[in-house]
Amino acid sequence: MRKKVIFGNWKMNGTNKSLEDFLYQVDNKVNNSKITAGLAVPYVMLQTGIKLAKNVKIAAQNVHFELKGAYTGEISVSMLKEIGVEYVIIGHSERREMFFETDLDINKKAKILLENNMIPIICCGESLETKEQGKTIEFVNNQINLIYQNISKQDAIKTIIAYEPIWAIGTGKTANSLDAEEVCKKIRENLAKIYDNLTAEKITIQYGGSVKPSNIQEYLKMPNIDGALVGGASLLANDYLGLVNYNE
């Protein structure tokens, strides 16, 4: 049985003070033992979060694929590991679109994280144009094929996949639960082709895209949706608690 994994993503929002206030309100109220609850925050807030959070896993929103070097403005795996970061989001559509990250970049990031015993949350998802062309499954599976190149099945089961249709991120539009389940099911079937059925069944697949307390239950009751990666609805303490303490 795969444990549900629900992570908020603050993106470029908040301050150290607002994170302190947020964790004071939520950390001791995260009380669902069947769920891993987390929050991805900007780099400058990571140490604050790790110091204060006991029940909420604090994640980074990105990492560079090199261990060190002349990469101004970047952060390495070793820097994150030193301060206690376990989870890192990679391949978010905003980074793909704004910073031209490719699936091969994301593959390198996944491998360096896994080599350092950290857990990548690997984002994938299609544009509205791709969806309207009826090519969602083909597109997303191609992303997965490239990202999981040369990753062993022993490492693959440590990863988390976040299926986030680009057209549903921050727009208020959502893939309905049946459509989201269909894509997540096809992702798992593709993972079974890359590895085997047993490995595919062990990999956590989240859904993201305008998830909020009022609809999270609808998604998480689906057999192939193992959690959620949530943006805007994770910024307020009450909303976050409504997500991670949802009624099954």
From Swiss-Prot:
Q: Which residues bind substrate?
A: N9, W10, K11, G170, S210, G231, G232
| Protein's UniProt name | Triosephosphate isomerase
Give the protein family.
Belongs to the triosephosphate isomerase family.
Please name the catalytic residues of this protein: H92 (electrophile), E164 (proton acceptor)
The record's annotation in HAMAP family points to: TIM_B
Q: What class of enzyme is it?
A: isomerase
Any one Gene Ontology BP term? glycolytic process
Q: Where in the cell is it found?
A: Cytoplasm
Organism lineage reads as: Bacteria, Bacillati, Mycoplasmatota, Mollicutes, Mycoplasmataceae
What organism does this protein naturally occur in? Mycoplasma capricolum subsp. capricolum (strain California kid / ATCC 27343 / NCTC 10154)
